[in-house]
From Swiss-Prot:
The gene is YEN1. Residues 500-512 have a biased composition (Low complexity). SMART domains: XPGI (SM00484), XPGN (SM00485). Present with 131 molecules/cell in log phase SD medium. This is Holliday junction resolvase YEN1. GO terms for biological process: DNA damage response; DNA repair; replication fork processing. Changing residue 486 to E: Mutants show a strong growth defect after treatment with DNA-damaging agent MMS. Its main location: cytoplasm. Pfam families: XPG_I. The keyword Hydrolase applies. The modification Phosphoserine is found at residues 730-731. One of its GO terms (molecular function) is crossover junction DNA endonuclease activity. Changing residue 526 to A: Mutants show a growth defect after treatment with DNA-damaging agent MMS. Keywords: Cytoplasm, DNA damage, DNA repair, Endonuclease, Hydrolase, Nuclease, Nucleus, Phosphoprotein.
Length: 759
């Protein structure tokens, strides 16, 4: 996996380089007007997907703590152990699902990609790195030069390295390649290291970026790298997909990449991270092929690699830049120059320790320091890696589905692909048919959508745009406008998804018609969000969508112009509603009003003859209902009780004596208020006594008796009291009292006549 410290030193220049994969594709399409083309380090992908795991940790732990964590393919185990040992790799269904998921994401965005596998000419010393013996020997030197000779001959005869291919591939490699063949995805088998071949493709212009976590891609001369393809917001460096760190911010829906543009970084950093500096830094610190120079850590190694006067990186490059198989003397000369360079570097560090490192390091400069330099063969693999000298561009032709702008995906044998995947017993899939249907359609939905034109009658109804929205990623840091594409099955020989679309119910209880969204789901049960910028605005379905939205907006505006019934706001709670039996939306001011007509007072007096004069009687005040039932009918003949409203208490409720006392307190009696009225009988007797003074003893006794009873009482004139009582308090009882008074008066008169006769 190269030197991880390189990523550490580049991190300050990569602050805003961690972006979603979809944004990277969109930005590239905007700037270049085409899809990006990416070379993928296949072994790195297989490691991250989980094909290679259960590594012998004890062997790796023997390396220095500062040494980077290496890929399983670069571990200490030999080829058979790495590929065939039960502890070094796996072909579990989970790894296959992860691999297919990555392929699906690239294909769904219409990205062009090319998988690059390691070849049989991969340096053998990488597999023997952690052996106790020296990593590179004379045998390695012979192997390197013989491999180069055989490599050149094979390309002259066959045009490739097929003559050097191993008789059989490891199991998981065979499985992956068979899957790629069934899906018609092209790939490249490099002659040597896959990273070196990826760099060759990028430098030659065949691809735009390299997708890899291996820093060796920079050492080989790569300039544009996509690093740490994962579902993490933050760039934590390369790791296996099986690792679980609680500190990592995980996003299960979106994939991110870290975009590294080395020329832009060097413009800011002053060319401190060019290829020569990074290569010399890797040699000093230690990489896949050596343990590093003793006594130098990452900071001291970086100081020496970036030193400009003297420029040790350029001197180191001059030693290994030339390569000639026919001139064997050049190799011995190279070794001699290499030893002199090591000695010169040691002496310079000893003399300028404070200037270079800020202090004097006696331990560093002791005898025995600066040991552990790699062999010339190991360094030659970085300066002159074994790659294909003549690249076959057929793998980039549009007959493969991993190249954009072709419709060959319709010709895939989906039945054979389905049976192959079913034989792997993929885990965590509840419905294989649905998973297979959705995965295949999501891979090629964008291509199928872009292939639609007017002659297709707008996709023959297979798909349509139903919604649009802005996808917020990383808390709104990235916003990607997307269209929601609803579609039906459009690939041949693929069973329809088991997800049944919504159907309109025939139940009589259903009163509402389906909504527009429900109708869309019934017609197109599957959906996928695609970035708007990957779809041209002139596309027929895009035009149809915006026309439909305009019609919907006009309908809403028409409905909004219709005047709705104005309703008064509720001004009371439901207590008033329960008490008055009225709706709360009605006007509160009308709640207490009665809908019954006010009854007129009864003008006919009860128990009085019709011929009697009632001119002196008061007409009672109008009566009003005391209890009105709003739910009663107007034609109801039931008895209605009313209250008679009078100005004062009726005289019917008191005796004549009490009535006299009450009358004295009445405010309406304003004549002689201090005079207490007497009964008519007493009044009559008093009058007669005044007219006829007693002359005899009987008459005197009668007069004394009357006077004694009326002592201290002032009498009113008889001609004023009686009419006043009749006028002001004329009622039934008053009439009876008047009749009684007349009767008493007659008896008094008779009594007076009898007294006169006796006398």
């Amino acid at each position: 996996m190269g030197v991880s410290q390189i990523w550490e030193f580049l991190k300050p220049y990569l602050q805003d380089s961690r972006i979603p994969l979809r944004k990277f594709v969109i930005d590239f399409n905007k700037s270049q007007k085409r899809a990006p083309r990416i070379a993928i380090d296949a072994y790195g992908w297989l490691f991250e997907c989980g094909f290679i795991q259960n590594i012998d940790i004890s062997a790796r732990s023997r390396s220095r703590s500062r040494s980077p964590t290496r890929s399983p393919r670069d571990s200490d185990i030999d080829s058979s152990q790495e590929y065939y040992g039960s502890r070094s790799y796996t072909t579990t269904g989970k790894a296959v699902i992860n691999f297919i998921s990555r392929l699906k994401e690239l294909l769904s965005l219409n990205v062009e990609f090319l998988l690059v596998f390691d070849g049989v000419m991969k340096p053998s010393f990488k597999r023997k790195f952690n052996h106790e013996q020296n990593a590179t020997t004379c045998d390695d030197e012979k192997e390197y030069y013989s491999s180069w000779e055989q490599h050149v001959k094979n390309h002259e005869v066959y045009g490739n390295c097929k003559g050097l291919l191993a008789p059989s591939d490891p199991e998981f490699i065979s499985l992956v390649r068979k899957l790629l063949d069934l899906m018609n995805i092209s790939y490249v088998i490099a002659c040597g290291e896959g990273e070196a071949q990826c760099v060759w493709l990028q430098v030659s212009g065949a691809v735009d970026f390299i997708l890899s976590n291996d820093s060796d891609t920079l050492v080989f001369g790569g300039e544009k790298i996509l690093k740490n393809y994962s579902k993490f917001y933050d760039d934590f460096g390369p790791s296996s997909i099986t690792s679980h760190s609680p500190s990592r911010h995980h996003d299960s829906k979106e994939s991110f990449v870290t975009v590294i543009d080395l020329p832009k970084i060097n413009k800011v950093a002053g060319k401190k991270f060019d290829r020569l500096s990074l290569l010399f830094f890797s040699v000093l610190l230690g990489a896949d092929y050596n343990r590093g120079v003793k006594g130098l850590g990452k900071n001291k190694s970086l100081q020496l690699a970036q030193c400009e006067d003297p420029n040790f990186s350029m001197e180191f490059y001059d030693i290994f830049k030339d390569f000639n198989l026919e001139d064997l003397t050049s190799e011995s000369l190279r070794k001699s120059r290499y030893r002199l360079f090591q000695k010169r570097l040691y002496l310079y560090c000893k003399d300028h320790s404070v200037e270079l490192f800020g202090r004097n390091y006696p331990v560093l400069l002791n005898q025995g320091s600066f040991e552990g330099w790699p062999s010339t063969v190991a360094i030659m693999h970085y300066f002159h890696p074994i790659v294909q000298p003549y690249f076959d561009e057929e793998v980039l032709s549009d007959k493969y589905i991993n190249m954009a702008g072709n419709g060959h995906y319709r010709n895939l044998n989906f039945n054979e692909l389905k049976y192959f995947l079913q034989s792997l017993n993929l885990p965590q899939i509840s419905s294989f048919d649905k998973w297979f249907h959705d995965s295949m359609h999501e891979m090629f939905l964008l291509r199928e959508f872009l292939s639609i034109d007017e002659s297709d009658n707008i996709g023959k109804g297979n798909m349509r745009i139903t919604e649009e929205k802005i996808m917020n990623i990383d808390g709104g840091k990235f916003q990607i406008p997307c269209f929601k594409i609803r579609y039906t099955t459009f690939l041949p020989n693929i069973p329809i998804s088991s997800q049944s679309p919504l159907k309109r119910s025939n139940s009589p209880s259903r009163s509402k018609s389906p909504t527009r969204r429900q109708m869309d789901i019934m017609e197109h049960p599957n959906s996928l969000w695609l970035p708007k910028y990957l779809i041209p605005q002139s596309h027929p379905l895009v035009i149809q969508y915006y026309e439909t939205q305009q019609l919907i907006q006009k309908e809403k505006e028409k409905k909004g112009k219709k005047s709705n019934k104005s309703r008064l706001p509720q001004k009371n709670n439901l207590d008033e509603f329960l008490r008055k039996h009225t709706s709360p939306i009605k006007s509160i001011g009308k709640v207490g009003e009665s809908r019954k007509e006010i009854l007129e007072p009864v003008r006919k007096r009860l128990f009085v003859d019709t011929d009697e004069d009632t001119s002196l009687e008061e007409i009672p005040a109008p009566t009003r209902l005391t209890t009105v039932d709003e739910h009663s009918d107007n034609d109801d003949d039931s008895l209605i009780f009313v209250d008679e409203i009078t100005n004062s208490q009726s005289v019917l409720d008191s005796s004549p004596g009490k009535r006299i006392r009450d009358l004295t307190q009445d405010e309406q009696v304003d004549v002689w208020k201090d005079v207490i009225e007497i009964s008519p009988i007493k009044k009559s007797r008093t009058t007669n006594a005044e007219k006829n003074p007693p002359e005899s003893g009987l008459k005197s006794r009668s007069s004394i008796t009357i006077n004694a009873r009326l002592q201290g009482t002032k009498m009113l004139p008889p001609n004023l009291t009686a009419p006043r009582l009749e006028r002001e308090h004329s009622s039934v009882l008053d009439q009876l009292v008047t009749d009684a008074q007349d009767t008493v008066d007659r008896f008094v008169a008779c009594d007076s006549d009898s007294s006169s006769t006796i006398e």
